[in-house]
């Protein structure tokens, strides 16, 4: 089950309309609609936490392990990092879709990918020309 399905299920159990949930979470009704349609994913962990609280569930349940990794990437590196990690997660999930990989093994693979992404990003900093480096990146 993915985020959009879990969100619909829990919202139905809580007897909340999209508008009421949006008001509680501090987002627009259209945002909740996009989440449920799967055309948008929440990257801000604070929004996911408000939704989870309103639905009496956890962020871990709503997002699943891969969603948490993407949300953490957004917190750590912004929207581009979140998109990169989300793309990696989608590709890896697709590779394992036909096989019999346990949930724990898939979660381990996602964690390893996340770690590898951040290590590569850190090592790549030394190849960035000085004129493009931020003040905090210079050594």
Model-derived segments and spans:
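Interfacial/linker helices and their anchor residues that mediate assembly or domain coupling
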Residues: 68-139
């Amino acid at each position: 089950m993915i985020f959009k399905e879990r969100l619909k299920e829990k919202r139905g159990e809580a007897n909340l309309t999209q508008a009421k949930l949006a008001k509680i979470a501090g987002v627009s009704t259209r945002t909740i609609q996009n989440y449920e349609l799967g055309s948008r994913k929440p990257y801000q962990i604070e929004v996911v936490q408000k939704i989870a609280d309103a639905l009496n569930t956890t962020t871990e349940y709503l997002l699943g392990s891969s969603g948490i990794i993407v949300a953490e990437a957004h917190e750590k590196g912004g929207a581009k990092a979140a998109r990169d990690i989300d793309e990696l997660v989608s590709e890896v999930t697709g590779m394992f879709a036909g096989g019999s990989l346990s949930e724990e093994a898939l979660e381990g693979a996602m964690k390893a990918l996340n770690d590898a992404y951040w290590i590569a990003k850190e090592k790549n900093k030394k190849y960035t020309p000085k004129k493009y480096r931020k003040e905090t990146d210079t050594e």
